[in-house]
Structures are given as structure tokens and as C-alpha cells.
Amino acid sequence: MSRTKKTRRITDIMPARKTDKPKQPMPKLGGGKNRKLTRYELDAQAREEKRKRKHKGLPTGSRNADPAEQKKAVVKEVKDPRIGSRKKVPLMVEFVNQPEKGRTIKAVPVEPIKPTLSPEQELEQLENNECLNQLLDDLEAGKTLSAEDQKFMNECLDRIDELMTELGIEYEDEEGDNGDALLRQFETMDINKFR
């Protein structure tokens, strides 16, 4: 953007003319005689005129709005009664109108969330169940079990069977024949075959 030369206005160079000045009534002091103003009074008048000339424009900023407009803006707004209530809200449900009738709120049945275990973990827990092991020991010893104990044992054994089939685990034969057969096969094996 190019610079433009500032030009001087005539009012900047030349003082205001007598014809441009508004006429002010001269103070009359001494019984109707027109007297000449003193130097001090003339200076005061000149300062006053200069101040008036200086402040010709409007005041700056939005804060300096007209007081009449501000009064119009101060009109009280109708507030919504729902906002800003000071009334305390009860946190517990109470029967305020009918406390003596003994009404109670029925509890909503919540199903307990069972922790889901992996099949391996569940099988390990069932195999290490002390109660089940005790019942199996009692049964092997020839003791008779109560109906509840028998039912519990059957449920646990059925669940163990399901988990073993799900995991693909087969029952181990507890007979010692397999171990003896392997030992006999090892002893009779010809080592020279593997050379």
C-alpha cells in the first residue's frame, strides 16, 4: 500500500476567526458598564473553547453507550421457574403421603453374574474340589451317601465328563499293565536295529 502525503487543513494553520466563534454573553459586573476581560479570564475562555473543539466526535468504545439505551436493556427478564430451584431433591424413594400403611418397594430380582471360566480352569477346579474328593473316598470306602451328596457328586462327575469330551481328553487306564508292557518291550528290544 502506497503512502499518501498528509495535507494540512486551514483550521490547523489559521486561528479561528471572530465570526466563527459563538457569541457569549459578557459578564456584567459593575452596574451595567461593559468592561474589558482580564488576561486570566481570556485564557480561561480560550481553554474552554479549545476543549470543546477537541471533543467534537463520539466517545470511543462500546462501553460508552447512551444511558437511555442502557436503561432499556435493564428491563427485568421473566425467569423460568424450573431453573435454579432451591428445593432439596430426596435421594431415597419415600412414601411421603402414606408412611403408615407400610408399603415397601419390591426388590428387582437381579441374576447373579457367574464368572465364566475357561474349560481348562473349570475342569481343574472340579478335579481339585475337596468336597467331591471326600465324597468319592467315602463311596470307595463303602459308606452310603445322602441324597443331596449323591446328587452333587453325580452333577460334578457329569460336568467333568462334558469338559473332558469338549477338550478331547480321554480317560487314563489306571491298570499297571501298560507300564509293565512298555518296560518288557524296552528290555527285549534289540538296540542294534537303531545303528
Curated annotation (Swiss-Prot):
<dbReference type="GO" id="GO:0005096">
    <property type="term" value="F:GTPase activator activity"/>
</dbReference>
<dbReference type="GO" id="GO:0042254">
    <property type="term" value="P:ribosome biogenesis"/>
</dbReference>
<feature type="compositionally biased region" description="Basic and acidic residues">
    <location>
        <begin position="66"/>
        <end position="81"/>
    </location>
</feature>
<comment type="similarity">
    <text>Belongs to the YihI family.</text>
</comment>
<keyword id="KW-0690">Ribosome biogenesis</keyword>
<comment type="subunit">
    <text>Interacts with Der.</text>
</comment>
<feature type="compositionally biased region" description="Basic and acidic residues">
    <location>
        <begin position="38"/>
        <end position="49"/>
    </location>
</feature>
<feature type="region of interest" description="Disordered">
    <location>
        <begin position="1"/>
        <end position="81"/>
    </location>
</feature>
<dbReference type="Pfam" id="PF04220">
    <property type="entry name" value="YihI"/>
</dbReference>
<comment type="function">
    <text>A GTPase-activating protein (GAP) that modifies Der/EngA GTPase function. May play a role in ribosome biogenesis.</text>
</comment>
<protein>
    <recommendedName>
        <fullName>Der GTPase-activating protein YihI</fullName>
    </recommendedName>
</protein>
<dbReference type="InterPro" id="IPR007336">
    <property type="entry name" value="YihI"/>
</dbReference>
<keyword id="KW-0343">GTPase activation</keyword>
<feature type="compositionally biased region" description="Basic and acidic residues">
    <location>
        <begin position="9"/>
        <end position="23"/>
    </location>
</feature>
